[in-house]
Amino acid sequence: MKYKETIAIVNDPDVTLGSLENNNIKSLNAWELKWEEMTNSYDYIILGGHMGAYDTDKHEYLLSENKWLSKSVDNGTKILGICLGSQLVADSLDGEAYLSDEIEFGFKNLNFVRNEEIFSDFQETEVFTWHRDTFKIPSKAKLIA
């Protein structure tokens, strides 16, 4: 299977690609982008941040990113949302990001609910979580883990 080049959208300067940085994935800062010039010729990873998708008063670029995400999904662009990124994808479609009543904190095993070949190397992966935001899954989205 041939994959397109992947671009990671960084939403917070403190939340980067980390160990994926050297895997031929280009990073772009969301707050510096001209969203109207973004193309659908890439696959995208939308990274997390300390804010919630609903914090648009403090982070106005999230509004432009949200509009771009909606158009990109409609155009068939492949998008992986991680943490805040998944909230933004949900908000751009018919889902909804919101503050949960519970805090999730600590190391957790990834729990895959779909068998996707692209994630086969991550089947036994432990990740660190620290968030209180969650979202309703949009009808166009696929829950993978």
Task: Label every PLM stretch briefly.
Residues 18-22, 35-40, 89-90, 120, ...:
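Short loop/helix-cap segments at secondary-structure boundaries that form the rim of catalytic
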Residues 1-75, 111:
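N-terminal beta1-alpha1 cap of cysteine-dependent amidohydrolase-like domains
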Residues 50-116:
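Cysteine-nucleophile active-site neighborhood
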Residues 93-145:
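Pocket-forming structural segment of enzyme catalytic cores
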Residues 13, 32-34, 86, 104, ...:
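Residue-level detector of flexible, active-site-proximal loop/helix-junction positions
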